[in-house]
Amino acid sequence: MPDTAPTAARARLADARLYLCTDARRSQGDLPEFLDAVLAGGVDIVQLRDKGMEAAEELEHLAVFADACARHGKLLAVNDRADVAHAARADVLHLGQGDLPVPAARAILGDDVLIGRSTHAESEAAAAAAQEGVDYFCTGPCWPTPTKPGRHAPGLDLVRRTAALGTDRPWFAIGGIDLGNLDEVLEAGARRVVVVRAITAAEDPGAAAAEFARRLRQAPAHG
């Protein structure tokens, strides 16, 4: 695990506002430089999400992520696989609705790794807000996104309903969020967001991350 004790990792999660999902930048060939730029810019949590990658290759790339997160004091997340999260000594495991059940993931990882859930309906958000062993959850998609082709986007109404739960558990809005619609997401009640293309495809990813971070930090603290 990048140099964070469990208590420190949970404190960082509580303070987190900007969560980035990115592939391994194989086509660009700039992964170390990209990670340094976005983490310095204000990304709090970074997740490697590169579907179809074999575990051995994923671990190789995660070593680069872990090094960058350790240097910048940020959280490293692994998508879907508890075994890979354990081997990579990640701070965070993120689980979708169809992935390994949380108790099974906890049996593999123990209590030291943070676990997040994806939610796509108010009932799922309410369950994640209350479920033992869950540390945070994501709610959306706010808008249709090519990252999840064919998935219905419940929209900002789900963000409003999630905000109305009044949970103290950290939660992030996700799905098609960019700098052009961020204010709508904030007005709906979110105070944390997951971003993909608005940073990964930006001309200057570090500057894009910094602008997201600035606007999120300036938003009122409720939500």
Swiss-Prot record:
* Short name of any one Pfam family annotated for the protein: TMP-TENI
Q: Where does Mg(2+) bind?
A: D80, D99
The record's GO CC annotations read: cytoplasm
Pathways per UniProt: Cofactor biosynthesis; thiamine diphosphate biosynthesis; thiamine phosphate from 4-amino-2-methyl-5-diphosphomethylpyrimidine and 4-methyl-5-(2-phosphoethyl)-thiazole: step 1/1
InterPro entries of this UniProt entry?
Answer: Aldolase_TIM, ThiamineP_synth_sf, ThiamineP_synth_TenI, TMP_synthase
Q: Which residues bind 2-[(2R,5Z)-2-carboxy-4-methylthiazol-5(2H)-ylidene]ethyl phosphate?
A: T145, P146, T147, G176
> The organism sits in which domain of life?
Bacteria
Q: For this protein, what is the EC number? A: 2.5.1.3
Q: Name one GO biological process term.
A: thiamine diphosphate biosynthetic process
**What are the disulfide bonds?**
none
What's noted on cofactor binding?
Answer: Binds 1 Mg(2+) ion per subunit.
Per the entry, which co-factors are needed?
A: Mg(2+)
Primary enzyme class: transferase
A Gene Ontology molecular function term for this protein is: magnesium ion binding
Answer yes or no on keyword Magnesium.
Answer: yes
Q: Which UniProt keywords apply?
A: Magnesium, Metal-binding, Thiamine biosynthesis, Transferase
Q: What does this protein do?
A: Condenses 4-methyl-5-(beta-hydroxyethyl)thiazole monophosphate (THZ-P) and 2-methyl-4-amino-5-hydroxymethyl pyrimidine pyrophosphate (HMP-PP) to form thiamine monophosphate (TMP).
Name-wise, this protein is Thiamine-phosphate synthase
What organism is listed for this UniProt entry? Streptomyces coelicolor (strain ATCC BAA-471 / A3(2) / M145)
Q: Give the classification, highest ranks.
A: Bacteria, Bacillati, Actinomycetota, Actinomycetes, Kitasatosporales
